[in-house]
Amino acid sequence: MTVIKIKKINDFKYNKLKFKKVYFLKTELASILNIYSRNVSRGIWKDYSLDCNHNSAIFSIYKSSFERAVLEIHKKKVSNGFEFLIIKNKKIIYTSKDLSKVLLQTEKIPKIIN
């Protein structure tokens, strides 16, 4: 019986390594939060959330805590690295492998003002 338990533990470790979550790097998150804080100080954005799973990391931006996300920045796992997306109203607005290019596009998107 102990052999079976060891095998289950090893299977768990294998699955854990196989399905590693995607996260924003510290520098990527700092860049996103820099843009976010600028827009919060202007009164355009009010709240954010982070979500991570096995194939993408999502930074969602809200006008209010009670509404749907106004804008989402996705870091998506692709076959040869990662890809960054801007999604607004469930539509892909911009895609790039370079986060700085994606963040420049957030400045061009019309802002939602009260």
Predicted segments with their positions:
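Negatively charged, low-complexity tracts enriched in Asp/Glu with abundant Ser/Thr
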Residues: 4-55
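Short aromatic-glycine-(Arg/Gly/Cys) micro-motifs in beta-strand/loop hairpins
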Residues: 4-10, 15, 66-92, 108-109
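Broad hydrophobic/π-residue packing in well-ordered secondary structure
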Residues: 29, 36-39, 58-59, 71, ...
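Catalytic phosphate/metal-binding cores of nucleic-acid and nucleotide-processing enzymes, i.e., regions
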Residues: 1
